[in-house]
Amino acid sequence: MKALGAVLLALLLFGRPGRGQTQQEEEEEDEDHGPDDYDEEDEDEVEEEETNRLPGGRSRVLLRCYTCKSLPRDERCNLTQNCSHGQTCTTLIAHGNTESGLLTTHSTWCTDSCQPITKTVEGTQVTMTCCQSSLCNVPPWQSSRVQDPTGKGAGGPRGSSETVGAALLLNLLAGLGAMGARRP
């Protein structure tokens, strides 16, 4: 019941969801079902970047991001998507208590606008991070790169309330589904 209260509070605080929701996955060819080793893919990206340069050395390469919804902490996202021009990669991490213990989920997607933020609503901490390099939106516990532990990045603790609200709602609903399956 506490999670339902958090969902209602998130709706009141953030207004109606809309902008920044996860994008529909593009064609199956964008999916990545291979092992965690991306060496071959990295070589393809370098070749693609070289062929997509505009006169003057400017690049028109589309950003590639992981795209998954509400995965538990121990699962990796293997789906990828080419973002539209001007989009960024986003990672949302939610830590909250459920009847069965601590639940951590992560969601990743392309979005038109992203500003890093960390908020706590009804005991659930939500952290959104943004990045602009290919396949950069992995949770910090799955990344070999050192990341800002606060999740604030250069943008500071501000963010689009619609984006955070929609993402928080998505993660809380996933948690409710996990709790509902275990009730007597």
UniProtKB/Swiss-Prot annotation:
Region ranges (Disordered):
21-35
InterPro entries given for it? Ly-6/neurotoxin-like_GPI-ap, Snake_toxin-like_sf, Toxin/TOLIP
Note the SUPFAM superfamilies from the entry.
Answer: Snake toxin-like
Please report which positions carry a covalently bound lipid of kind GPI-anchor amidated glycine: G151
Q: Name one GO biological process term.
A: cholesterol homeostasis
Name a single GO cellular component: apical plasma membrane
Phenotypic consequence of Y38F: Loss of sulfotyrosine formation
Q: Which residues carry this modification: Sulfotyrosine?
A: Y38
**For this protein, what is any one GO molecular function term?**
lipoprotein lipase activator activity
Q: What is its main location?
A: membrane
The record gives the effect of mutating W109 to C/P/T as: Promotes formation of dimers and oligomers reducing number of monomers. Loss of LPL interaction
Primary gene name: GPIHBP1
Designated name of the protein? Glycosylphosphatidylinositol-anchored high density lipoprotein-binding protein 1
Extract the ranges annotated as region (Important for LPL transport to the lumenal surface of endothelial cells): 27-50
Tell me the PANTHER family matching this sequence. Answer: GLYCOSYLPHOSPHATIDYLINOSITOL-ANCHORED HIGH DENSITY LIPOPROTEIN-BINDING PROTEIN 1, UPAR/LY6 DOMAIN-CONTAINING PROTEIN
What biological function has been recorded for the protein in this entry?
Mediates the transport of lipoprotein lipase LPL from the basolateral to the apical surface of endothelial cells in capillaries. Anchors LPL on the surface of endothelial cells in the lumen of blood capillaries. Protects LPL against loss of activity, and against ANGPTL4-mediated unfolding. Thereby, plays an important role in lipolytic processing of chylomicrons by LPL, triglyceride metabolism and lipid homeostasis. Binds chylomicrons and phospholipid particles that contain APOA5. Binds high-density lipoprotein (HDL) and plays a role in the uptake of lipids from HDL.
